[in-house]
Amino acid sequence: MEDEPTYPSFRQSLLVTISLCLTLFCVSLDETVLATAIPRITDQFQSLNDVGWYGSSYLFVFTATQMAWGKLYTMYPAKWVFLTGVTVFEVGSLVCGVSPTSGALIAGRSIAGLGAGSINAGAVLIISNTIPVQKRPIYLGCLGVVHGVVSVLGPVIGGLLTDHASWRWCFFLNLPIGAITVLGIVFCLSTNQPSAGHLSGKEKLRSMDLLGSAFFIPGILMLLLALEWGGSQYAWDSWRVILLFVLSAVALAVFAVVQVRAPEKATIAPRLVTNRNMLGLIGYIVGNSGGLFVFVYYLPIWLQAIKEFSASKSGLAILPTQLGMVAASLAGGILVTVVRYYTPFLIVSSLLAVAGAGLLSSLHPASGLGSILGYQVVLSVGIGLGAQNAMVVPSVVCAPGDVVMAIATLCFLQMLSSSIALTLAQTVFHSRLVTNLAHRAPSVDSALVEQGATRLRDRVPADLLPSVVGAYSQAVSETFYVGVAMCALSLLGSASMQWKRVPGHKEATEKVEGEGQGQGQQQEQDQGQGWGEVGESHALAHPTADK
């Protein structure tokens, strides 16, 4: 009989959990805190064209590296891998806080995203190593509560810091919290023995999807650059933009071939994306996640530039989006538990999201507060209704051994779609702003308007201001069309899924017992690939995995 695992004392476990919660507070805050600070940042750096990069740089690097971090946790002690990630994240926060230019801020966001990829996976793994299994759900629930609360309060915190201190404190805030975390982990967490720690250096390298990453990361970067440059710095038919699109397509095609030829260490398992229900679910997740981020980032810009809201007030004004999602997510989980079918709720979720996105795209300078708040409720209830239920689907439509990998794949594509959607939205915003100004106020140089979001009225003559404000508002509304299109994609995805019944307790037990042996073997393989920690970290630390 195997020896019972030895766990730290309650005091040590509590201190470690507090340290993990503080770190997740910083990472979760970084996802939404900039939403209300960005307009002020664009004023200081005169960088309205970089809005998309402030979010997409963080999200893309986070997404591209999280699988590698998950793998490292199986090879090296979790304590030191986690501390490495925290250190990288803190360095990125420091770079953001002291950044003298927009480019430096984007670089800092990328560095922070690199470290954040380690923190989500590591927090769940460390809890698993330090807390007895019977008490684990409570501690894991604490991680989920932290993410949920911070997701709601992030824009408000960002607005308050921007108005009463400086937008730089959105990043400086992470530094003392990170220092406390490092001390807690160093002195309270013991070093574990990783499952793949016995492998040689060559074997560790061979087990990672380095070849796939070598094509995937440049492929997505070239796609983002093409979307960013097209129609703004260069014409869509310029050789630079065309070349980037072609090279991106080639790199991503090679990445797909690598995934098919080496499925045992694939970043995206081919057998999952060829499953009809999983493919529909991917469309649903990608659409709603990408659409949500467009509104989270551009609605505060509209509120501050057009309605003259302060950063703090705009943070309060977008609370319906955050609160509605949390409430609808809880309600959706209860409804599916009772009805036992998730597909109808995913379809209703998509329909409401499309309706809410369409309503928000109709906002204009004369729109009242009731419309602004009410339209957000429709969107947030739509997206929130399916947030938790989407993560139930893999347990129903996938083999038991594929569930963890499926959840990790969904979270991977979810974050990636948010990054791409923000870049595409930025391109639409810039091109439509230039076009609208040329039509409504041809005598106004678009460069003046593009220098910042909140000083619009300081740079434009009073007699031309109504025309310029109208052009600006129309450009944001047309940017919201990207969100509408993304939500429509989610509708196509949910409508294509079969109506599968969520098994009851007895049925689920029989399924697990019947396939238990295959599940154990497959999960061991997935854990070895770093999928286990990453999948669980998103499902538990991100209970509303749509931010």
Swiss-Prot record:
Coiled coil: none annotated. The chain crosses the membrane at residues 14-34, 50-70, 80-100, 111-131, 138-158, 169-189, 210-230, 238-258, 279-299, 316-336, 343-363, 366-386, 392-412, 475-495. Residues 504-514 have a biased composition (Basic and acidic residues). InterPro entries: MFS, MFS_dom, MFS_trans_sf. GO terms for molecular function: transmembrane transporter activity. One of its GO terms (cellular component) is plasma membrane. It is found in: Membrane. It is a multi-pass membrane protein. This is MFS-type transporter ungB. Keywords: Membrane, Transmembrane, Transmembrane helix, Transport. MFS-type transporter; part of the gene cluster that mediates the biosynthesis of the unguisins, gamma-aminobutyric acid (GABA)-containing fungal cyclic heptapeptides with the amino acid sequence cyclo-(D-Ala1-D-Val2-L-Phe3-D-Val4-D-Ala5-D-Trp6-GABA7) for unguisin A and cyclo-(D-Ala1-D-Val2-L-Leu3-D-Val4-D-Ala5-D-Trp6-GABA7) for unguisin B. May be involved in the secretion of unguisins. The gene is ungB. Residues 503-547 are annotated as: Disordered. It comes from the Eukaryota. Belongs to the major facilitator superfamily. TCR/Tet family.
